[in-house]
């Protein structure tokens, strides 16, 4: 097992192959997370041709290059101009843990000192180049306060920028290019590969409440000039921000997941409070609109996420209600064993209960899966690792302050 507790230190670039992760003059424009259109506008604003955006995007995302001096198909004068006025800076990793089964977790410090968490889960198929799914955060904390969610109990601080969102994917790919100490310096960019095959916007926060930065980030994930991921390999999960679901359906074609967790309004109002604003009838209508678009060649489905809470939402009656609720909606149901966290008011459903629930759904004709727990040796519900690191940071700061106080007394 490799579970690392020591914060990873990132240093300024000093060599041609090192990665600059320090913003020397915070007035510089961070190009990370800019869409091709945004980057083209930036180049026009500095008196350059907009086609440079394609070149720079390829360097950043297909080669992992953040040092403009290494972008050799740019003129020397343009490289100098970019070095003076721009930067490519992902969020800073302050903590990471790697599991025996390949699961990786990072805690990032974003602007202002806030912390967000990212998790990478490899497929359990023993393939060296198999599926690797990255769970990305979109906000610092979450305002929805779902009663079973650790992140919601930490409150909401702010939205993440596109650079902070896409930077999580950039660092996850970079981690496969680095040594066992997870240093991101001295990477041979000629060997760069984008190992992450799937992205799910299921980390901290509600993605549709941070709509524009999230959509911009997903555009780059799909772009052939950047990550080139298939639209079925990029999934946005929402608790049900209905107006934005309609907006997303018009703007971007990615896979949709709904954090449902209850088959009736009374129970969902308790578990997922946003249901009081957008009840199930409205949510299901928005889901059907997303799936049944005007192009008959688009064969879409919605993934229904359903956390299994002992004695709360896991009865046979609840399963039958779920069957009736979904009706003819093309959907795959993912049952999620509850992952307890400190002071949680719920328990995990038994394995027998989960399988009985699953059988009812399967017999009704739905594809139903049970999420497998991964990374047991570094296990934590979404948001818990951030809480643990933040607690340690606060304790360390308090201890250091007590030393200073004693020295000054």
Swiss-Prot record:
Keyword entries, A-Z: 4Fe-4S, Cytoplasm, Disulfide bond, Iron, Iron-sulfur, Metal-binding, Methyltransferase, rRNA processing, S-adenosyl-L-methionine, Transferase, tRNA processing
EC number: 2.1.1.192
Designated name of the protein: Dual-specificity RNA methyltransferase RlmN
Domain Radical SAM core: 128-377
Leftover remarks: Reaction proceeds by a ping-pong mechanism involving intermediate methylation of a conserved cysteine residue.
Compartments where located: Cytoplasm
HAMAP family named in the record: RNA_methyltr_RlmN
PROSITE patterns documented for this protein: RADICAL_SAM (PS51918)
Cofactor: [4Fe-4S] cluster
Biological role stated in the UniProt entry: Specifically methylates position 2 of adenine 2503 in 23S rRNA and position 2 of adenine 37 in tRNAs. m2A2503 modification seems to play a crucial role in the proofreading step occurring at the peptidyl transferase center and thus would serve to optimize ribosomal fidelity.
Ligand binding ([4Fe-4S] cluster): 142, 146, 149
Catalytic residues identified in the record: 117, 382
SUPFAM superfamilies: Radical SAM enzymes
Annotated S-adenosyl-L-methionine binding sites: 205-206, 237, 259-261, 339
Entries under PANTHER family matching the protein: 23S RRNA METHYLTRANSFERASE, RADICAL SAM CORE DOMAIN-CONTAINING PROTEIN
GO BP: rRNA base methylation; tRNA methylation
Organism encoding this protein: Psychrobacter arcticus (strain DSM 17307 / VKM B-2377 / 273-4)
Disulfide bridge partners, by residue number: 135-382
Note accompanying the cofactor annotation: Binds 1 [4Fe-4S] cluster. The cluster is coordinated with 3 cysteines and an exchangeable S-adenosyl-L-methionine.
């Amino acid at each position: 097992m490799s579970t690392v507790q020591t914060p990873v230190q990132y240093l300024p670039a000093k060599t041609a192959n090192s990665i600059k992760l320090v913003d020397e003059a915070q007035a510089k424009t961070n190009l990370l997370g800019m869409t091709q259109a945004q980057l083209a506008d930036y180049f026009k604003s500095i008196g350059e041709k907009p086609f440079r955006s394609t070149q720079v995007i390829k360097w950043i995302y297909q080669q992992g290059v953040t040092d403009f001096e290494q972008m050799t198909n740019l003129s020397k004068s343009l490289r100098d101009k970019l070095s003076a006025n721009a930067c490519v800076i992902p969020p800073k990793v302050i903590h990471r843990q790697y599991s025996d089964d390949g699961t990786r977790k990072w805690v990032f410090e974003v602007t202002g000192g806030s912390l967000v968490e990212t998790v990478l889960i490899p497929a359990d198929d023993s393939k060296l180049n198999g599926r690797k799914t990255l769970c990305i955060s979109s906000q610092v904390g979450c305002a929805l306060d779902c009663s079973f969610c650790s992140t919601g109990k930490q409150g909401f601080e702010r939205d993440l920028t596109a650079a902070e969102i896409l930077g999580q994917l950039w660092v996850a790919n970079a981690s496969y290019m680095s040594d066992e100490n997870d240093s991101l310096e001295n990477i041979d960019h000629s060997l760069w590969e984008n190992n992450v095959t799937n992205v799910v916007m299921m980390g901290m926060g509600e993605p549709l409440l941070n709509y524009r930065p999230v959509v911009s980030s997903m555009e780059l994930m799909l772009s052939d000039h950047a990550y080139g991921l298939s639209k079925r390999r990029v999934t946005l999960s929402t608790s049900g921000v209905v107006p934005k679901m309609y907006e997303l359906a018009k703007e971007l074609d990615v896979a949709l997941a709904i954090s449902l967790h209850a088959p009736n309004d009374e129970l969902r109002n308790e578990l997922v409070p946003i249901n009081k604003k957008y009840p199930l009838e409205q949510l299901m209508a928005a889901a059907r609109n997303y799936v049944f678009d005007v192009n008959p060649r688009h064969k879409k489905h919605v993934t229904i996420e359903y956390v299994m809470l002992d004695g709360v939402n896991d009865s046979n009656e609840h399963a039958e209600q779920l069957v009736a609720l979904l009706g003819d909606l093309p959907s795959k149901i993912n049952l999620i064993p509850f992952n307890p966290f400190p002071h949680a008011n719920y328990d995990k459903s038994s394995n027998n209960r989960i399988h009985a629930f699953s059988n009812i759904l399967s017999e009704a004709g739905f594809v139903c899966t049970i999420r497998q727990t991964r990374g047991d040796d570094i296990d934590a519900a979404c948001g818990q690792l951030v809480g643990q690191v933040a607690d340690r940071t606060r304790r360390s700061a308090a201890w250091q302050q007590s030393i200073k106080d004693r020295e000054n007394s």
